[in-house]
Structure formats: structure tokens, C-alpha cells
A protein has these predicted regions:
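Catalytic cores of nucleic-acid ligases and guanylyltransferases
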Residues: 1-201, 206-305
Length: 305
């Protein structure tokens, strides 16, 4: 996200270029009292102030999808903006200077803003922590602790890097925790859109509960174009029922599904929800009886909690 203040006006933009001021009025109001103009790159999180860690990412959706949240909602889902980088200050574009120098500027202004007692921003704004591993094994230790903090891993940045748009290789690197995985049975397919129009590319997967298959996740990414076309042909030949654009399928295909997080969910029949599910392998070597169960999913959840 980018948090911007220019000429007295504060705006909060998502990565998808959506203005979300109305969803987070407390942040906009607090930052409007800062006298400096700025452009900050960062992340918005629902924050556990007692433990000083993020709550699960899914809770942020309860704020983003709600305009003009009531005071009770703001208290129930308290947010914080964590600044990663300072891109502009008082009209001066500093994206071309080294990251380590931008960090010095960020820390200087954060200290200045924080010391304004009439506008304490510490309850809604902070800057990200820096870590300096002594070697790769040490970095691995930090990475593995990320899941305990409800984060996906580390971002490694060159100290002399500029701030640029797009995916620039060799400047910043995401060092993410290894995904969790379950083998699941394909039970539904839905037609794609855009370049994938005319092909079945959106899939739903199930896990066993006793002798019944219960849907637990949907995914649309991970297969190669050749695999998509091969699976599309199979889907058309093995449809049980049609529900508008959705087809119910013979339970014969097993896929390895990877995801970043698993948690209890009362909204789903399975009782669980996963974050960022995607297909990582078509398990043609497995029969549906080899697929994982909901019991396996709950065991996985206990292991990481």
C-alpha cells in the first residue's frame, strides 16, 4: 500500500490502485495532523497490540470491504500502517537515492512525528523492523519464525537499491516460508475468463471426512498450459452435473494443493480456510483414496500453531 499526504490531503491506495480512505478513517485522520507531506510504501495490518504481532491477514478484509466502519468495528479490528520505505518527503522525490539513505530519512521523520505529543501516532503507525542475519543459517532461523508472527517470511533488499516499479530481479528478494501442502480431490470446475475463456480453469478441491469428500479450497493457478488443456478435455468427458458455469465432476483426479496458512473457519463446511491456495502438482500417481483427510488438515494446523 501507499500512504500519501500532499497539500493537506491524505490518501491510502492499495496495490490494485484502489482508494480505501473510507475504510480506514482513523488512519487518515491521525496522519492528516502531520505537518510534513510524504509518500510512504508499506502495509496495512489488523494488529495485536498486546503481543505486538499481526492478526491473520483475512481479518483485514473485514475492514477493506466495509466503508465508514463504526467505532466498535474499529476497536474490534484495530489497524496499523507499517512503513517499509519513504519515497517522497515535502515534495522531494527520493526514490533514486540508496535504500540505506532512504531508511535514515524514514527513521528521522518517524521520530519527529512520534514526538508530537498532541498527535500520538504510535497506536496506528510504525516503521518495519530491520534484521541483520550474520549468515544464511541465521537468516533461515528468522524466516522460520515468520509463521509465528503471522507473516509470510522475509524481504531481502540491497542496501544500495533504488525504489523502482515492477519486479526488478536482483534488487529485492522474497525469502518466504515453505508452503503447507495437502493432496486433494478435484470435484468442481468453472470456466475461465479473458485469455482462458473457453477452458475450464477454476477448480475446487475436497478432502475426505469418513467416506465423504468435503470441499476445502478453490484454486486456478499452478498448471501449465498443456496441463490445462489436458484437464479441460477430461472435465468435459467426466461431468456429472452442470450448475450454470460450474460442472460437478467424477471424483477421480488428485492434485497437490499448496497454501500459506490454514485456520479454523465457521463459514465453510470443512471448518477450515486456507490462504493463497494453488496447484503445485498433478498427482497422476495417486488414487482418490490416497488423498488427505480433514483430520490431516487439522493435524497440520496443530503442528504450526
Amino acid at each position: 500500500m501507499q500512504l500519501i499526504k500532499r497539500s493537506g490531503n491524505v490518501s491510502l491506495w492499495t496495490r490494485g490502485q484502489e482508494l480505501v480512505n473510507e475504510s480506514f478513517p482513523e488512519l487518515v485522520e491521525k496522519m492528516s495532523h502531520i505537518k510534513d507531506d510524504f509518500v510512504l510504501d508499506g502495509e496495512l495490518l489488523v494488529w495485536n497490540f498486546k503481543e505486538q504481532i499481526a492478526f491473520d491477514f483475512s481479518l483485514l478484509q473485514k475492514r477493506i470491504n466495509r466503508k465508514s466502519p463504526t467505532r466498535s468495528i474499529q476497536i474490534k479490528y484495530p489497524i496499523i500502517f507499517i512503513a517499509y520505505d519513504l519515497l517522497e518527503i515535502n515534495g522531494r522525490d527520493i526514490r533514486e537515492i540508496k535504500l540505506e539513505n532512504r531508511r535514515i530519512e524514514l527513521e528521522k521523520y518517524f521520530s519527529k512525528w512520534q514526538n508530537k505529543t498532541e498527535n500520538n501516532i504510535s497506536d496506528i503507525f510504525k516503521i518495519c523492523d530491520l534484521i541483520f542475519p550474520k549468515d544464511w543459517p541465521d537468516a533461515l532461523t528468522y524466516k522460520e519464525k515468520s509463521r509465528e508472527n503471522n507473516t509470510e517470511g522475509l524481504i531481502i533488499k540491497k542496501k544500495n537499491s533504488i525504489y523502482s516499479f515492477g519486479r526488478k530481479k536482483g534488487i529485492w528478494w522474497k525469502y518466504k516460508v515453505d508452503p503447507m501442502q495437502l493432496d486433494a480431490v478435484l470435484i468442481y470446475a468453472k470456466g475461465g475468463s479473458g485469455r482462458r475463456a473457453g477452458l475450464y480453469t477454476d477448480y475446487s478441491f475436497a478432502l475426505w471426512k469418513d467416506k465423504e469428500l468435503i470441499k476445502f479450497a478453490s484454486a486456478y493457478s499452478g498448471l501449465t498450459n498443456i496441463e490445462i488443456k489436458e484437464l479441460d478435455k477430461w472435465i468435459r468427458k467426466n461431468t456429472i452435473e452442470k450448475f450454470g458455469p460450474v460442472r460437478s465432476l467424477k471424483p477421480e483426479m488428485v492434485f497437490e494443493i499448496s497454501f500459506e496458512k490454514i485456520q479454523i473457519s465457521n463459514r465453510h463446511k470443512s471448518g477450515i480456510a486456507v490462504r493463497f491456495p494453488r496447484i503445485t502438482k498433478w498427482r497422476k500417481d495417486k488414487k482418490i483414496n490416497d488423498a488427505d483427510s480433514l483430520e490431516n488438515a487439522y493435524e497440520l494446523m496443530k503442528k504450526i500453531s
